[in-house]
Curated annotation (Swiss-Prot):
Impact when changing residue 7 to I: In allele NKG2-F*02
Consequence of substituting residue 119 to R: In allele NKG2-F*02
Extracellular side of membrane: 96-158
Resulting phenotype, residue 35 to E: In allele NKG2-F*02, allele NKG2-F*04 and allele NKG2-F*05
Species this protein is from: Pan troglodytes
Compositionally biased spans, kind Polar residues: 1-12
Subcellular location: Membrane
Keywords: Disulfide bond, Membrane, Receptor, Signal-anchor, Transmembrane, Transmembrane helix
GO biological process: one example: positive regulation of natural killer cell mediated cytotoxicity
This protein's name: NKG2-F type II integral membrane protein
Membrane topology reported for the UniProt record: Single-pass type II membrane protein
Length: 158
């Protein structure tokens, strides 16, 4: 829209408005009436269609970013928000992890002191801090009941 020209005219008529006619500057027809306001704009739009098709860098809204720059700004904004969330999460979680590690270490120590059981003898199986023996020898029932007492253990009936 390179060439724009506007003409503003106000027509005030005398007491007999039906008879008065006045020609406006730049207008070839006469107008009659009590009071009329006329706004004439002549636009020279010779290159208007070619301006919109060929010139993609001209934007009429100055407050908005063009699509490629806007997309880039949105992506960078999202990346910034994700990075800030990660940093904040790290700042909050690092002290918590340290406290949990200390608690875990002290709990393991207390369990080792409370359990204070030695290793199981050879051919015995450890399960849940207990030792189990599965014998392959043939014994009578009385021998099978007496054998754990001799070993200072308890018998488990299955």
């Amino acid at each position: 829209m390179n060439k724009q020209r506007g003409t503003y005219s106000e027509v005030s008529l005398a007491q007999d408005p039906k008879r008065q006619q006045r020609k406006l500057k730049g207008n070839k027809s006469s107008i009659s009436g009590t009071k009329q306001e006329i706004f004439q704009v002549e636009l020279n739009l010779q290159n208007a269609s070619s301006d919109h098709q060929g010139n993609d860098k001209t934007y009429h809204c100055k407050g908005l970013l063009p699509p490629p720059e806007r997309l880039t700004a949105e992506v960078l904004g999202i990346i910034c928000i994700v990075l800030m969330a990660t940093v904040l999460k790290t700042i909050v979680l690092i002290p918590c992890i340290g406290v949990l590690e200390q608690n875990n270490f002290s709990l393991n120590r207390r369990m080792q002191k409370a359990c204070d059981c030695g290793h199981c003898p050879e051919e015995w199986i450890t399960y849940s801090n207990s030792c189990y023996y599965i014998g392959k020898e043939r014994r009578t029932w009385e021998e099978g009941v007496c054998w754990p007492v001799l070993q200072r253990t308890l018998i488990c009936f299955l």
